Amino acid sequence: MASLSAQQQRALLQSNLPAEDSFRVTLQRQSGLQVLQLNLGRLCNMRCSHCHVDAGPDQAHTQMPEAVVQQCLDAMERLKPELVDLTGGAPELHQSFRQLVRHARSLGCRVIDRCNLTVLLLPALADLAPFLAEQRVEIVASLPAPEELSTNAQRGDGTWQASLEALRLLNRLGYGQQGSGLELTLMSNPAGEELQQLTPCDEIRWRKTLAERGVAFNHLIGLNNMPIARFLLELEEQQRTTAYLQRLRGAYNPCSVSGLMCRSTLSVSPQGELFDCDFNQMLELPLPLELASVGLDDLGGREI
């Protein structure tokens, strides 16, 4: 599959963005650090058509080296984030995943595992789900839709059934069950140019459809497709980049600015570079800071 370099992606976005001053306005970071997000590499047991990090089974060479893992462990102690967010690829495939989880939990940090669900069924990771429950890791599980057809179309044949099997496994361990304290959030990420408009009726449909298949969850959230990586390439091939950016512009909600992830998050790449968010990480727009030495004073109030 062809791919676009970060430089090519930035150029395409720049040439297709609406010519408005609002796109040049800066934001200011909040004080402190709420989320330390660690991208452990693009290795994944799946290869989804919409993936904004170009993850797949052929990405073992992108895994975070142990020297950077150690810097992440040290940064947890120095920065004292409220939440450590582990992402990838499939972060669980990194050999230091459990070490990072244990260290974060020992410091009192909440931990989120951004999980594709099917990774929980790999024979080599048979004890992974019990480990997550034991460490009380919060799971944000990606599932395009509660129906089989659209899920398989985006993620491959058989992935819907495998995802349901993994969800039932998590339910048996207490995830998604009232009063257990084990949080299971489903994240819907539809393919193509469709924008998420999750309503209370949508959540009712999700709960009813999945309950009929023996699955329960705590929360449902939605994510729209960022026009980068594989999705940007698809838009370019269909000559739809400008139209999609205009659609995003039309859906802009100014009330969302105060809660943007870049204002309270520090994103770390597998190579140890620092970014405001993982989307900027994929576009190679780093911060002028070093993981080994960054402190809270470097982050608070900084312009984005």
Sequence positions of predicted segments:
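Core AdoMet radical
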Residues: 35, 55-64, 79-94, 105-124, ...
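C-terminal accessory region of radical SAM enzymes
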Residues: 216-248, 266, 273-275, 279-304
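Conserved strand-to-helix beginnings and helix N-cap segments that scaffold or border functional pockets
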Residues: 94-98, 125-126, 196-200
